[in-house]
Structure formats: C-alpha cells, structure tokens
Amino acid sequence: MSDDAWLAAQRKVLARTAPAPYADTLGRVERIGDGIAFVSGLADAALDELLRFESGASGFVHTLEADLMSVVLLDDGATVEAGARVTRTGAVIEVPVGEGLLGRVIDPLGRPLDRDEPVATVKRMPIERPAPAIIDRDLVSEPVETGVLIVDALFAVGRGQRELIIGDRATGKTALALDAIVNQKHSDMICIYVAIGQRSTAVQQVIESVRRYGAPERCVFVVAPAASAAGLQWIAPFAGVTIAEYFRDRGQHALVVIDDLTKHAATHRELALLTREPPGREAYPGDIFYVHARLLERAAKLSAKLGGGSLTALPIAETDAGNLSAYIPTNLISITDGQIVLDAALFAANQRPAVDVGLSVSRVGGKAQHPALREVSGRLRLDYAQFLELEMFSRFGGLTDAHVAGKIARGERIRALIAQPRFRPLRTVDEIALLAALAEGVFDAAPPAIATEARAQLAEQLLGAGMAAGWMDAPLDPATQAALVTTVREIVQRLTLEAANVPARTGSGK
C-alpha cells in the first residue's frame, strides 16, 4: 500500500470516529480506620483489584458488598480521609522480578529499603498466580543440602519440597532456616527470605548474618516489619513466592524462607475481623486454610519440558507451649510435605539445633537424598530415639546392663555430632564420613568432646586427601567407605592423644 492510499484510509477511519469525553468512575471513602477504608461508588471494581486514593496511597479490594467494599491499605492510613476520592486501576498488585533484585532489601511492593537507588528490573508479575498443574510437575529427586547434619541425614529436603519448620518461640527456627540459606553459598540456588511482622532489629541481624557468612549477591530480602501496614504484611509471602517463581520458570532453582506464617495468619485474622467476616475456629476466618494452601502449592519441581526449575519452600510457624494440635500448626502440617519440630526443652539443654527426632518427618525428601548418605544414615534415627528413651529411664537407676550402657554411650556420641554450631555448615562428604565412622564404632571409645572436635577438623583433612569428589550420587562402595572411616579414625586418635598430652604418633594410626 502506498503512502497516499494509507493516508486516505486513515482519514476515513478518523471521519467515522466521534470524539467523546473519557468517563472514569470515582469512588468515595465513607469511613476509614485501622488500615481499612470502606469505599462506595465503584460498583465495577473486582476482588483484589488495586485502587488509588487521591492522596497517592493505594490499597486492594478485600471484600465486596452490595453498596460498599472494604479496601486494605498498603500505605500509611493517616493520608487517607473520609470523603476522599478513589479511582480504579484495572490491575492487581504486582511486584518487580528479575536479576536486579539480587542482593537487595525491598518491601512487598518492590520498593527499596536498603538504599535510595531504585530496583533495576524491567518486568513485573502479579503476586497471585496459579500453582503449577500436576502434569507440569516432576518428581522431587534432587537434594537441598542444608549443611545441618541432623536435617540432611534424617529429614532430607528435596528441591521442590515444602518443609515446615515449627516450634515454640526462641527455639532456633530462624537460625535453622538461615543456616540453610548460608549453605547455598556455593550452590546454584537463589534464596529469598521473607520477613513478616518481625522486629526490624531481628531482620537486620538476619541480613547481616547472610552478608557475613553467605552469598548476599544471590539473595533477595522481602521485608514487612511489625511497624508496617497490615496489608503489606499480608501480601509479603505472595510477593516473595512470585519473585522465586521468576527464577524457577527460567529453569533455575530457588529457595524461599517465609518467617513466619503464624504472624501472617494473625494478620489475616485481623483483616477479616476488621472487615466483619464471620469468624471461625480461634476467630480465624474460614478461608485461612485456602490462603496458605494456595501459597505453598506454588512450590514445585517443574518438568523437563518446562525447564526443570524448582521452588523449595521452608515456611516457619510458631507454637504455643509446644502445642502442635492448634489450628494453624495442624493446617500447615497437613499442607506441607513434612515438618522439622524444634523442642524448647532440648534448646534449654543446649542441644542445638533442637530437633525433635520423634515428631519430625520428611515425606518426600528421602527419595532425593544422596544414595551414599542414605546408606550410612539408615540406623541413625532408630539408635538416637532408643538412646533418648534409655537415657530418660536411666535417671531412675537400675539400668546396669552392658548392652544398655553401650547404647547410651553410642547415643551420647550421636548427640555430640548433631549438636552443630550456627554458620558452620557441613559438606555432604563430611556428613557421610562422620556417619560411616559412627557406624563403625570409631567414636565409641572417645569422649563426646572428641567427636565434636573431629567434626570441626574433618573438612580440611578430606580436602587434603582428595576425598571431595562427586561420588555421593551412587551407593557407597567398600573402598571409599574404608578410606573415609580411616581418615576419621586418624583424626579421633590424634585428638585423643593430644587430650592425654601424649605426642601424636605418625603413620596411619591403625
């Protein structure tokens, strides 16, 4: 088509066009309080739609009624007054995603909290997205190496799994999740930490710990502290999962820690009561299970056809006096693929991490565990559980049987090995060597303190012996197992001699 013909066609189009003013529906704030605005006049507004107030504040539609809707504010409610005008945006809440977020601290709307420099992203995604369909998922077959011996050996987490970390207040829940993040320093996983309703000082400590021990350039921190609006706290986990989904959908692997969903449930209850939704058990609204289920179902291992990426979720929940049968804990336990239960009594006894081996479980991660690690950790849980039971009865006296004494001695060495300091992750090869040596009785004659010291020195010794190869993906062959056990035995014997102030012998120490 020539330029003249095109120009003539456009003139005909313009001739048929009747200019008219653009009509925009305006709403009105009828009343406002506690972070909730009740708005009238927007009959066409949709649920979860983003609205703008004339002061510049924003909020999303939470409930719809015949002539009134409740809008949850995402900003300071002091700038919104009754009688103010409200306009629709025709869009839902979106969050920026992409490589530009790595190393940054943002709020759930993507606004920077660490510095004035804006976030360098070019793409935005809605925070509410459907979970992958069953046919789009693959089996959980690759491990997430947390570096925590008791977790990797007994309650292994796989890529694409949802493993709940639950326990009373101040029992090391965040510390355990933080150790898992720090251990990804040399892996290919992108880590997203979501803080909901936490103290700003506590969040700052987490960020500083990752910067000191981990790889902050491969982490994203989504923060909605206790002082922020309830609406921001409510959308925080959805924003964090959306950021993680961006990397998962590109064939990469992401780990998201949500700290914590108990506070998120309390925020959801607060918003429901303020908007006069019917309360249910423990005053939570009836949809609280659905809210958390649709969030955590987005964690998945995608099929090879979709790139094979994964999103692993480590949600955290807080219990009251160890009550796992409360409403929110039972909901989350039924939604997730397992739970790591932290016990306050173990924590008080200086057993850290304070994992309760009797109540903890990983339903799918065992299939993703390294075959060599699975082989050497087979009896660990049973031996340790028997030790805890025998130790309790031995306090009353009367257990003088040599077999019982041997089990108690073995259990004390197990406890010394799994009592792991923070920010001291173990490589998988170190874990295999320790457990193989434990099964061979290397630690039986040594004091528990020797086992702890041997664990600290093992990594350097194995690197020097060239034992850090990727042989863990196959069953442990006898020659490799013997080499690992010999290395650990030499360390234990040397430490034992040093403790007795006897010069260490040279040679193999056999």
Swiss-Prot record:
Uppermost EC category: translocase
Primary role: Produces ATP from ADP in the presence of a proton gradient across the membrane. The alpha chain is a regulatory subunit.
Location in the cell: Cell inner membrane
Protein name (record): ATP synthase subunit alpha 1
EC number(s) on file: 7.1.2.2
Membrane-related topology note: Peripheral membrane protein
Pfam annotation, one family: ATP-synt_ab_C
Family membership noted in the UniProt record: Belongs to the ATPase alpha/beta chains family.
Primary localization class, coarse: membrane
A Gene Ontology term for the protein's cellular component: proton-transporting ATP synthase complex
One example GO MF annotation: proton-transporting ATP synthase activity, rotational mechanism
Catalytic activity: ATP + H2O + 4 H(+)(in) = ADP + phosphate + 5 H(+)(out)
Record-linked InterPro entries: ATP_synth_asu-like_sf, ATP_synth_asu_C, ATP_synth_asu_C_sf, ATP_synth_F1_a_nt-bd_dom, ATP_synth_F1_asu, ATPase_a/bsu_AS, ATPase_F1/V1/A1_a/bsu_N_sf, ATPase_F1/V1/A1_a/bsu_nucl-bd
Subunit structure: F-type ATPases have 2 components, CF(1) - the catalytic core - and CF(0) - the membrane proton channel. CF(1) has five subunits: alpha(3), beta(3), gamma(1), delta(1), epsilon(1). CF(0) has three main subunits: a(1), b(2) and c(9-12). The alpha and beta chains form an alternating ring which encloses part of the gamma chain. CF(1) is attached to CF(0) by a central stalk formed by the gamma and epsilon chains, while a peripheral stalk is formed by the delta and b chains.
Gene from which this protein is expressed: atpA1
Binding site for ATP: 167-174
Matching HAMAP family: ATP_synth_alpha_bact
Domain of life of the native organism: Bacteria
Disulfides per UniProt: none
Keyword Cell cycle: no
Coiled-coil regions, chain positions: none
Species annotation: Paraburkholderia xenovorans (strain LB400)
Keywords for the protein's UniProt record, in alphabetical order: ATP synthesis, ATP-binding, Cell inner membrane, Cell membrane, CF(1), Hydrogen ion transport, Ion transport, Membrane, Nucleotide-binding, Translocase, Transport
Site (Required for activity): 360
